[in-house]
Amino acid sequence: MKFFLIILILLNFLTTAPKANEVNIFSSRHYSSDIQLYEKFTSISGIKVNVVSGNDAALQKRIIEEGSDSEADLYITADAGRLGLFDQKGMFQNSISPKIKSIVPKSLRSDNWTGIAKRARIIFYSKDRIDKEVINNLRYEDLSDPKWNNKITVRQSNNIYNQSWIASIISNNGKENTDEWVKKFVKNFARDPKGNDRAQILAVAAGEADIAIANTYYYALMLSGQKGLEQQQAAKKVAPYFPNQSDRGTHMNISGGGILKYAPNPENALKLLEFLLTEEAQSHIVKNTFEYPIIDNVEPSEIIKSMGSFKQDLSTPVEDYARFQAVSLELMLRAGWK
């Protein structure tokens, strides 16, 4: 009898013992500055932050396979397309508190995940070979014009940033119009797509192309000197241009996160997500990653500010990037975009 009584006491203790005051992040972001930010959150809240880093494919595979046994509370990554596609697999829970809803524009979140920083995908052109007047009032749609034949460089069609960019064009112009546009756009490539965004800027600097499509933070990273003198000098040979200023504005994407379906610490995950949207956290993020803030009243880094202010496309829902991702890739491959 005493034995069974001891067992009952132990079971009661195990079921009522307080959970550890922690939150577990699975993140594909690769910034040491993010770790500094999590440490700041711990100092303020007392909640310990555990981080599992890796590439998106590996992290998502682990989360899915572990299911309800997963220790992951919060998934953080770059690109709304990635977040949306993972959401379609049913891996998030409602992550949007009234506080987040009041801070983040509806176009930069869903019910289950939210942006924590923005990035722009823009045109970089050769200062030596392209007159600024030729670039003025340029839209993404204009890049299909034959006058740009053999002048454009961009990375491969399997890149999620390109897929989300094309998805945004589908969202605004429809599938048929985008299909025709992509076919003409691909004909203007100066070379077969290869390399990352910085490789596209380097190609323009080297004279292999006149126009590159790349995210702004890659250019800022090069210009900062963090990638070496050669890349810094290359960045100085190109100039940024923000397209579509006469209509919807420049294509914007996000870094973001959402609370996972089986999160063991959802309350702590929400506290961290809300913290990442405070002025202090937003300022820390954009100063270290060269991204744009999600919230107002926060200035981007000096290098990003030097690129100038511009009209951002905040009307196209970033949810559409996952919604049209499959169609986007279909059109790109059909057009011969390698």
Task: Please name every model-derived segment.
Residues 21-85, 338:
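Early extracytoplasmic/lumenal segment of secretory-pathway proteins
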Residues 26-29, 113, 125-128, 132-133, ...:
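Short beta-strand->loop
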Residues 80-91, 108-135, 167, 252-257:
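Periplasmic solute-binding protein
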Residues 124-129, 244, 252-265, 284-287:
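A bilobed periplasmic-binding-protein/Venus flytrap-type ligand-binding module shared by bacterial periplasmic
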Residues 168, 173-242:
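Ligand-binding pocket segment of bilobal, Venus flytrap-like solute-binding proteins
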Residues 291-338:
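An extracytoplasmic/periplasmic, membrane-proximal ligand-sensing/linker region
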